[in-house]
Amino acid sequence: FEGRTYQYPITIERERNYHHGVLKSEAFLVSKAREMDREVMIECRYDANAGNDAVYRDFPHEFKCKITYRLTAEGLEQEVVFFNRSETRMPLGVGFHTPLTIPFAGGIDADYVMRLAVGEEVELDGRNLPTGRRLPLSEQFSKLRREGLQVTGCGPIEAGFTLREIDVDGKPFRGALVEHLRTGVRTCYELSLI
């Protein structure tokens, strides 16, 4: 990145890869917690700097990561903000593996479909690393943009994608949603870019 090389420990031996990022197992400090009439909010932060942690050893940037969770009657909102305190720009990627219990609105597993705001498939090599090539979506992955894939019938999706908004209820949507086809009950995981 900008002439700098980052070296991380191997965490997937069979692929000789590192995964899950530098903050996955780090302890965050609860900096705020509030319970109001209609909302519960918890804010956690992590400060990386040369004097206090091993993260800096592999990723030599001083930064602050703040994660805020808000629970209301409308749902759970998660906000992630990074503050770069370094003298240089730092590369950044954020990802979460959010588990969902299905069925969450009754019925059977086959009643649920998943839709994703995907654009193109990112080609991966034998080590599951991006090759730099982008491919058109396969027929199966094209369903993610349209009617959705049956959640329990598609198997694991071991692929990377570019982001392209989809239409949900007449509005642009960036993210993933799982919907119960009979009732219309949804769980949404939406991304907003700042």
Predicted regions span which residues?
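A short secondary-structure junction signal
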Residues: V55-D58, E79-V81, P91-G95, Y112, ...
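Short coil/turn motifs at secondary-structure junctions
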Residues: N49-G51, E74, R85-E87, P103
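Short Pro-Gly-centered flexible turn/kink motifs
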Residues: F1-Y8, V80, Y189, I194
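Hydrophobic residues positioned within well-ordered beta-strands of beta-sheet architectures
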Residues: I42-C44, C65-I67, Q78, V94, ...
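Extended, loop-rich substrate-binding clefts of extracytoplasmic carbohydrate-active enzymes
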Residues: R4, P9-A73
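Short, well-ordered beta-strand segments enriched in hydrophobic/aromatic residues
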Residues: Y69, L76-N84
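Active-site/ligand-binding surface loops and adjacent short beta/alpha elements
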Residues: R89, P99-L193
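Histidine-centered catalytic micro-motifs
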Residues: V22, G93-T101
